[in-house]
Amino acid sequence: MVVHVSNPVARLTRTQVSQIFLRKALLWDNRQPVLPVDQAPDSPVRRSFTKEVHRRTVASVQTYWQQETFAGRGVAPPERTSDANVLAYIRRFPNAIGYVHADARLGNDIKVVIVTP
């Protein structure tokens, strides 16, 4: 998981990350809105993230979001087509959180958040 360097979060549990990306957790501890950003549905990193964090398939999470949207309860996080686009989103919106490939070049304005079981 990656966030803007100004974000005070350093560690999250897998459950917290899942809640953030399913928009069940809406605020950081500092009361600022959490802005999750997903990768494209066909991205290998998205498939891996979804399996590890949500314990579901991408299709299952997409179905969840279709139901939530139809019921008027929320909309899915925005999707970006590459690591570079996820990082650009986080740079633009310091309250954002996303995920990228392990070998992505982060730069000094992005930091890694440790995810624990």
Language model segments and positions:
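Exported/periplasmic ABC-transporter solute-binding proteins
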Residues: 1-117
